[in-house]
Amino acid sequence: MERSLIILKPDAVQRGLIGPILTRIEQRGLRIVGMKLMQIDESLARRHYAIHEGKAFFDSLITYITSGPVVVLVVTGKNIIEIVRSMVGATNPVKAAPGTIRGDFALDIGRNLIHASDSPENGEMEVSLFFRPEELVEMHRSTDQWIYE
């Protein structure tokens, strides 16, 4: 099973979108195995977004992600990376399809509400940045038999 890190960014928290976004995640049948409200400090932000270091938007990205509380969660499941990214929508909300989180709730690329891991390898790396193993729960729901083959 793959794992994906999802971050509901400061704009999602400030706009009161935690509930609607979590509802979509749960209604889709995704299994949440870790979740916390936290403030990302600059050191963690720089490690998480290290791939973007040196790009023109890097400093503003760090300022943005550290500007307020975020909700960080880990979801797990078969093909979870692809599923979550299709739910999230294009990075630029202008290009995000209606029905996606960004397509329905975001308007600007600089305030695009949500982060999701882009590969199984990055998912594992990102999960380890934000969660200790003991913070994650092994969860099996009675509905799993109706979701996964």
Swiss-Prot record:
It catalyses: a 2'-deoxyribonucleoside 5'-diphosphate + ATP = a 2'-deoxyribonucleoside 5'-triphosphate + ADP; a ribonucleoside 5'-diphosphate + ATP = a ribonucleoside 5'-triphosphate + ADP. ATP binds at K9, F57, R85, T91, R102, N112. One of its GO terms (biological process) is UTP biosynthetic process. GO terms for molecular function: ATP binding; metal ion binding; nucleoside diphosphate kinase activity. SUPFAM superfamilies: Nucleoside diphosphate kinase, NDK. Its cofactor is Mg(2+). It is an enzyme of class 2 (transferase). The keyword Cytoplasm applies. Keywords: ATP-binding, Cytoplasm, Kinase, Magnesium, Metal-binding, Nucleotide metabolism, Nucleotide-binding, Phosphoprotein, Transferase. It comes from the Bacteria. Major role in the synthesis of nucleoside triphosphates other than ATP. The ATP gamma phosphate is transferred to the NDP beta phosphate via a ping-pong mechanism, using a phosphorylated active-site intermediate. Belongs to the NDK family. HAMAP family: NDP_kinase. This is Nucleoside diphosphate kinase. It comes from Roseiflexus sp. (strain RS-1).
